[in-house]
């Protein structure tokens, strides 16, 4: 195995193929942006080093692609060769200006400011590769010791990376030689060294390299005077020293926009990114400036193309920022919507048609997602079966909700103050705090008192008719958020609570409990005045208003008051002439559903 020691020189020519590393498209996509930048810097620097010593005469295709900012995997990978490990200790390092021969002309310049302001992973490794003043590192003794495990190292960088194992920092260690790297790419490229012949060894620190030029570049970190450039460049300018000729040859890369000059193409490419950052686009709606891709992301926020759990909150914030428009209007009821999809879903309420039909059982559905779930029954796709009642659910969420029915074996406990039912004593005790606390907030219209201002504000929506929570599917509005949440279950058709007697399904356990009273005949809510009983608490409340004469729902147009909100809604249609209930056969419209039902009986008699 030949080894390059001392001042031994080899006449074997070095080509760009000896240093180039090629990636396939799949391998390139696995690299992170930092790893791609590191690969670009090393490849460009290796090429320009070969050009400076006269070892490269033709520009390879991969260099042309890298300088244009294109992906290098487009190059034909037929000449795959192994190269130096990226990010390791044998990277190319320029000679510091402080080591220049001051006897010659003053050509050395300070590093460009823009070159210093753009830190790269390569720069970090070069910084740690600066030779130490301690000469023990070259005498074969390991002078740096880890305080945690006692392991010794030649270099401070190796010690720092090793200590990352103790501190928990992300690092990658070679299983063969124990060398540690910050990036997985550096480790992969380094492991290629163990699979090849180790030919070139540094006589000062003992590092081994598989390429001669890599060793020559590495030697410059030990002694600035041993620069391999002088053999080729000393004749180009006899009045200058060999080292000064290096600056004259390398400093040829000039920025066309600002005129700055750089010694490496990689430094020029990094500098150009500063000018590219200034190219921003302003979004006309809010005036904020962005680059190409971020402006598209911000545009989605402005126009509302963003999913969020609390859509009502996002909608209210959007209305405060920009003027909201609802260009899509229903021709039958004149309701307007911001999206055409919401309008199409709303129009199904008038036509009562379900456009999605199953080809096997002819069952129709209002939404495509519901049809897809239904098709699982025919296809035999994975289903969830209950162990207790053998009910089969198509979705895991429905199966979890269904299991709660079997857990609800305890008898419901009723609150004596308001009549609400609870599944356990713990929930009842929490509820009783509402009745025991002080209620300083009083409603001016119905004199009802509340313990919190938020409860009073929600209650006053009954009198004002305000309904800020609107369903995006059908356009129906509600005064409380919880009412909107319950309503959305109608569209999802998720009804896990099924009656054991008639098979009717419900979306809430409370609705199932109310329905079961129809079969049992139970009427737990009795009027204290006339002893009349009801199956639902709301029916009792409406009945008691007939004794007290309370009418909390007042019309804003004529001032007429009503005991229930549904009566007020029906009354308001007399002012607006709204007739939402339309006959599908003759097109006649009515303001009440009961009137439509009576009218449809005429068509049924004609058919008979």
Swiss-Prot record:
Primary location recorded for the protein, binned into one broad class: nucleus
Basic residues compositional bias, start-end: 124-143
One GO molecular-function entry: RNA polymerase II cis-regulatory region sequence-specific DNA binding
InterPro entries: KRAB (IPR001909), KRAB_dom_sf (IPR036051), Krueppel_C2H2_ZnFinger (IPR050826), Znf_C2H2_sf (IPR036236), Znf_C2H2_type (IPR013087)
Keywords recorded for this protein, A-Z: DNA-binding, Metal-binding, Nucleus, Repeat, Transcription, Transcription regulation, Zinc, Zinc-finger
UniProt superkingdom: Eukaryota
Family to which the UniProt record says this protein belongs: Belongs to the krueppel C2H2-type zinc-finger protein family.
Name the record gives this protein: Zinc finger protein 667
Protein species of origin: Rattus norvegicus
């Amino acid at each position: 195995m030949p080894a390059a020691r001392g001042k031994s020189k080899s006449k074997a020519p070095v080509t760009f193929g000896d240093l180039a590393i090629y990636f396939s498209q799949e391998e390139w996509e696995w690299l992170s942006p930092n790893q791609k930048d590191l690969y670009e810097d090393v490849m460009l620097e290796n090429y320009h080093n070969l050009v400076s010593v006269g070892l490269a005469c033709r520009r390879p295709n991969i260099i042309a692609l890298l300088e244009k900012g294109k992906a290098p995997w487009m190059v034909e990978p037929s000449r795959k060769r192994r190269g130096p490990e990226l990010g390791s200790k044998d990277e190319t390092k320029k000679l510091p200006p402080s080591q220049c021969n001051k006897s010659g002309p003053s050509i050395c310049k300070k590093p460009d400011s823009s070159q210093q302001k753009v830190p790269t992973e390569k720069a970090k490794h070069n910084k740690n590769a600066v030779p130490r003043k301690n000469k023990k590192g070259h005498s074969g003794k390991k002078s740096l010791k880890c305080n945690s495990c006692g392991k010794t190292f030649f270099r401070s960088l190796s010690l720092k990376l090793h200590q990352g194992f103790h501190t928990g920092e992300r690092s990658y260690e070679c299983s063969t030689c124990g060398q540690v790297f910050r990036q997985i790419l550096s480790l992969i490229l380094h492991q290629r060294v163990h699979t090849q012949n180790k030919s070139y060894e540094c006589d000062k620190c003992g590092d081994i390299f598989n390429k001669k030029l890599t060793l020559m570049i590495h030697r410059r970190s030990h002694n600035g005077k041993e620069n391999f450039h002088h053999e080729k460049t000393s004749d180009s300018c006899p009045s200058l020293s060999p080292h000064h000729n290096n600056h004259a040859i390398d400093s040829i890369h000039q920025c066309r926009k600002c005129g700055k000059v750089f010694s490496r193409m990689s430094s020029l490419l990094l500098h150009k990114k500063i000018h590219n950052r200034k190219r921003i686009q302003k979004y006309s709606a809010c005036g904020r400036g962005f680059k190409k891709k971020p402006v598209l992301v911000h545009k989605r926020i402005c126009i509302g193309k963003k999913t969020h759990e609390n859509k009502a909150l996002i909608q209210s914030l959007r209305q405060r920022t920009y003027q909201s428009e609802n260009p899509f209007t229903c021709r039958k009821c004149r309701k307007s919507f911001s999206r055409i999809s919401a309008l199409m879903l709303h129009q199904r309420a008038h036509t009562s048609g379900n456009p999605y039909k199953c080809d096997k059982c002819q069952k129709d559905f209002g939404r495509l997602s519901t049809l897809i779930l239904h098709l699982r029954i025919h296809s035999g796709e994975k289903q969830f079966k209950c162990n207790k009642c053998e009910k089969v659910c198509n979705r895991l969420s429905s199966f979890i909700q269904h299991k709660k029915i079997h857990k609800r074996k305890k008898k419901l406990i009723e609150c004596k103050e308001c009549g609400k039912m609870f599944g356990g004593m713990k929930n009842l005790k929490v509820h009783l705090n509402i009745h025991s606390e002080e209620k300083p907030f009083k409603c001016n219209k119905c004199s009802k008192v509340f313990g919190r201002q938020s409860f009073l504000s929600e209650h006053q929506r009954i009198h004002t008719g305000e309904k800020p929570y609107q369903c995006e599917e059908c356009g129906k509005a509600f005064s409380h958020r919880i009412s909107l949440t319950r309503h959305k279950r109608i569209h999802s058709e998720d009804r896990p609570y099924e009656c054991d007697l008639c098979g009717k399904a419900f979306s809430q356990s409370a609705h199932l409990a109310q329905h079961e009273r129809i079969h049992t005949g139970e009427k737990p809510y009795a009027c204290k005045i006339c002893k009349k009983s009801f199956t639902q608490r709301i029916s009792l409340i409406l009945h008691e208003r007939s004794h007290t004469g309370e009418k909390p729902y007042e019309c804003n147009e004529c001032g007429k008051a009503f005991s229930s909100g549904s009566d007020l809604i029906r009354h308001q249609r007399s002012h607006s002439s709204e007739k939402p209930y339309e006959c599908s056969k003759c097109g006649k419209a009515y303001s009440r559903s009961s009137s439509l039902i009576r009218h449809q009986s005429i068509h049924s008699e004609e058919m008979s």
